Amino acid sequence: VPEFGNPKDEVKWIWTEPFASVFPGESHAYSGEKLQKMRPPVFCNHCENPPCVRVCPTKATFRRSDGIVMMDYHRCIGCRLCMAACPYGARSMNYRDPRPFTAKINPDFPTRTKGVVEKCNFCEERLAKGTLPACVEACRQKALTFGDADDPRSDIRRLLETRFSLRRRAHLGTGPQ
């Protein structure tokens, strides 16, 4: 992960936002203080019907058969149509070359250059090796879970069946996962 030292240059894969921004319309004047102070993690929703895929002129953004929305960074021309189309703000533009600011280059993951859009890809290079995405592994509070919601034996499915959950902006028809 590049350390630019200037927040405006950062490339975001995951970040936090106030609850009211993440789930507009779900909080109200009588929401408890805990809910109002909550800052849920935000990242690509890997939508069932991703608008970013439809608008990409080079097909650099695509949806895999397993539902993960991916990017071919070598095909990206940096037009930012995908950024404009994403209703979740889940994409970042590399305005600077990230390589000089990256302490350790991951040989399993290509480095991108200035002028390319990035997003969360669920650490597909880790998934290919059978390991969890880095954010899930690093979260000390165990607030993040990864898995196949269609698999009735998966942790994510169990959580969806036993805990309250919200889909971000479900009314848009993108089918956020």
Task: Give the positions of each predicted feature.
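Non-ligating segments of multi-cofactor redox enzymes
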Residues: 1-177
